Amino acid sequence: MHGLVHVLVCGGTSVQWLDTTTQEWCRITGELSSAARGVGMRWITICPYVGWFTEMEREQVCKRIANATGGSIDRSTVTHLDNDGFTISFNVCADGQQRFVDVADSLPDSLITEDTLSTAMHSPALFDPDLIVVHGPANKVPQSLMWELGYSELVFVDTPWRRLQSSDVQQAISDFTTRERRFGGIDV
């Protein structure tokens, strides 16, 4: 057990997600399931690194992922409950600010608090990600991660998104476990 409950994998552009076939989504889902086994993980969230979708493209990507995983679609998210008891959630919105606006719009004004926003931003997961695995350059933070950056550890991997392997996520978990988490604290 590594203390990991929720891992977010951020990779690929919206164009790459559009071009990802049902078979490739099956493979990616299998790789993520394999990586989660044995470490106590309950949720994996996947989102694009950068880009945007038209409404028609968003629906196309969601349907392709749902067909590959047997998951259910709710707006911009496809959720798949794995046989091993954890949930994989694919959020097709690559714009963190837009995701925030969408979540805020979905809540009644009287219910908007930091807690309700956090819960809605990570739904179906109940917690902020412990670890974010970024498939992209280490000198640039993905625009999709506006909300998650405050309390999550980032690990950057060099593997191109569509070649994601369980070993990439397992190596990121290994890197995570050797870090001293300070949760925004600084040395005095």
PLM region spans:
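Flexible, compositionally biased loop and terminal segments
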Residues: 1-188
